Regions:
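FIC/Doc superfamily catalytic core
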Residues: 1-200
Length: 200
């Protein structure tokens, strides 16, 4: 779903905001449906990622999801993008900022965190920071959610997105950029579940 404001967007067809794609779909509504159809299949090809998690891990997830549709899948974007009042990380800083965050993440011991509230706040902080990176031209949220599912599985937790309203998720992402991770943490409190609780 191409809803970004972009400067000099070579990812799109000339005089259009529709992303260039392998099926040569020029209509945004049809492309949105194609994305849903394709990713509903390709998501099942993604194997569980293992530590250490890096930018390459996220790129691989994105590639698996979208390479059927986009030639640039798994590649860090080289243009500036924004959505609403949110301006995402400038291309020149994406790799260095991603490396900084992944290095910090590697030092966390969420499997040793007994306080579920504290865990959810920590996860929310990282999620919001990674979300600001938005390293790809499209498909950032879908790839990032899968990455965090894998990270949390290794820490002994499962993420259940069931019952999560799209409007609440969007509001938490916007708040994560504008004011902090509190709204995201409040959502995660209900959707991050210890595996031992889910499977006694």
């Amino acid at each position: 779903m191409n809803r970004y404001r972009v400067w000099r967007d070579h990812y799109c067809y000339p005089d259009s905001d529709v992303l260039i794609n392998r099926y040569d779909i020029r209509d945004q509504t049809l492309l949105d449906q194609a994305e849903r159809d394709v990713t509903a299949l390709t998501i099942h090809t993604i194997r569980l990622s293992h530590p250490p998690f890096t930018l390459n891990t996220l790129c691989h997830i994105h590639y698996c999801l979208f390479s059927e549709l986009y030639s640039w899948a798994g590649q860090v974007r080289d243009i500036s993008i924004s959505k609403g009042q949110t301006r995402f990380c400038q291309p020149a800083f994406i790799i260095s900022e991603a490396n900084r965050l992944f290095e910090k993440l590697a030092g966390e011991r969420w499997n040793e965190q007994p306080d579920h509230n504290a865990l959810c706040h920590q996860v929310a902080w990282y999620y919001c920071e990674f979300n600001v990176l938005h390293p790809f031209r499209e498909g950032n949220g879908r790839a990032l959610r899968i990455l965090f599912e894998h990270i949390l599985l290794h820490a002994g937790y499962q993420v259940s997105w069931r019952g999560l309203k799209a409007s609440d998720w969007l509001a938490a992402n916007i708040a994560g950029y504008q004011s902090g991770p509190e709204k995201m943490a409040a959502l995660f409190l209900h959707h991050i579940i210890p595996i031992s609780d889910k499977n006694p």
